[in-house]
Amino acid sequence: MCNIAAYVGTKQAAPIIVEMLRKQEGWDSGYYTGIATIHEGKLHMEKDACNLETLLQQTDITKLPGTIGMIHGRSRGADDYRFAHPFISTNGKLAYIANGCGGIFKADKTKFPEVYERLTNLGYRFTSLVEGDYKQLPGGKKVHGSDLKCQNINYYMDNGLGIVDAMEAAYCERGSEIVSLALYTEEPDRITFGRMNYPMFIGIADHGIYMATTPMVFPEDARDITLLPPTSAGQVFMDHYTVKPFKNPPCKVAPLTPVVYRDCYDAVVAALEENDMDHDQIDRLLRPMIPGGDCPPESALDYMILNDLQNQGRLIIKTTQMPGVKEGSIRTQFIASLKK
């Protein structure tokens, strides 16, 4: 699980998305941080294996130019900045970030190396490639799954697909329980998204559109907050967005009905009345409670419930410090608690 924020509009994007990530970093990120914007047809990017505050101290990311951008904080992984998002396509035109995991698709051990071998043989490059005693690829090699997805989108675009259809093709060829965003230099006025089951909310403002993993972090002027549809891809512009459902989705995402929400809300409240919980613990509570599909959207439901509790004034967000990726580094962990 990771955390994402994005913006497209008339204002400078970087300061806006930095503040949105700051408000959610403790839920399930802070080990790695990365940001990308587009300005005058060029990608601007910074990333490292550190929390947001450290990246702010090391770089001037709030000064990155452009009125369109995205930022990413991720959970623990290899101790290497190369595993931080965004990933850049081999042609240098696409920046890609994602949130999620293999989930129900993790058991398929063949598709990943098949896609990697095809792309490698065609000359696509993986900046996250590390060598060691890994079991993911032949020869003990390993690449980040989002790097693979990024280069595969590049491949499908090189073979004639538009970016939305390329996103769908990459999602459906090798399934993952994820959501992702992409910036493309040849379409500098929009953010492309793909969503399987992990959450991506949008909020409308007079000057543009916000996007985030959780609605809890939107600025006060956000309205008409909406969860983007599952098993779909589309694009977000400053004043509207488009959605295209996958023709042959690799899984069925369970629907979030009012009854499901009520039952899950009650379960979370009951659990929090007994003990404080972090985001992962709430996810594990909710996942088996969502019927009607093989790919439950538990993280979206988790954040919807926490957002409602926050709006009701019932939620307390406690913080604790935990070790980061690099020696001596730290990250902040959020813990959900109810007012007694």
Question: Which residues fall in each region the model found?
Answer:
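Conserved short alpha-helical segments that host acidic/polar catalytic motifs at enzyme active sites
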Residues: 1-340
